[in-house]
């Protein structure tokens, strides 16, 4: 009941009024996604994301170290990932820009350094390419939405193996963004063999390995370690 909304301007039945069920007049929300006029949905998303993110990032900074990175990777990034997968990019652009800016400020505080130029590229580069994997959500919003939309068009009535095959045939978000990140990798390593070797090593032995398993660490991540990665 706590996650339900009453889709009517008429008050809910008396037996349901003990719960917080405000009548929904301008748009509806189903499984976390808003449905309604574009301008209304855009404002709903801004109200939910933009007004709450500063507090969430602030708590992340208070925790710091390993715990803060875990929250960024396991909680805040997935939250935006859900939004961009379920809403058209035209509706999420402002939320994405705000989130990306807050993310950079948070990481700069962790690393105690300005993240720009090549450091920002490494920050945005996925861990499979040796980067930190803290991607700009605006870079992937279009691809995430298209992959989710195509997947949703596979009918759940499709029998057994045919359903699995149809889902497997859907081009994934990772596949859709691969060309973009391959281009970013080339930009970061152009005429710089040392940079290329560093990222290849990071993809196999460095940040890629431990960032995916940072929750398994038995000690906090220090500011110096984060700073070293960004440099």
Description of each model-found segment:
Residues 1-231:
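Nucleic-acid-interacting cores, centered on viral/eukaryotic replication and modification enzymes
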């Amino acid at each position: 009941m706590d996650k339900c909304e009453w889709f009517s301007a008429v008050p809910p039945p008396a037996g349901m009024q003990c719960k917080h069920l405000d009548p929904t007049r301008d748009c509806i929300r189903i499984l976390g996604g808003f449905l309604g006029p574009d301008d209304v949905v855009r404002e709903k998303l801004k109200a939910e994301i933009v007004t709450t993110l500063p507090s969430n990032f602030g708590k992340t900074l208070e925790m710091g170290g390993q715990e803060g990175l875990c929250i960024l990777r396991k909680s805040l990034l997935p939250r935006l990932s859900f939004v961009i997968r379920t809403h058209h990019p035209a509706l999420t652009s402002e939320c994405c820009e705000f989130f990306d800016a807050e993310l950079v400020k948070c990481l700069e505080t962790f690393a105690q350094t300005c993240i720009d130029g090549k450091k920002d590229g490494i920050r945005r580069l996925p861990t499979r390419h040796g980067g930190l994997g803290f991607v700009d959500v605006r870079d992937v919003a279009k691809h995430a939405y298209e992959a989710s939309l195509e997947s949703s068009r596979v009918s759940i009535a499709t029998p057994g193996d045919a359903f699995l095959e149809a889902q497997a045939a859907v081009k994934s978000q990772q596949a859709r963004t691969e060309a973009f990140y391959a281009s970013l990798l080339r930009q970061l390593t152009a005429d710089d063999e040392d940079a290329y070797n560093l990222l290849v090593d990071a993809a196999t032995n460095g940040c890629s390995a431990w960032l995916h398993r940072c929750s398994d660490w038995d000690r906090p991540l220090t500011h110096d370690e984060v700073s070293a990665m960004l440099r």
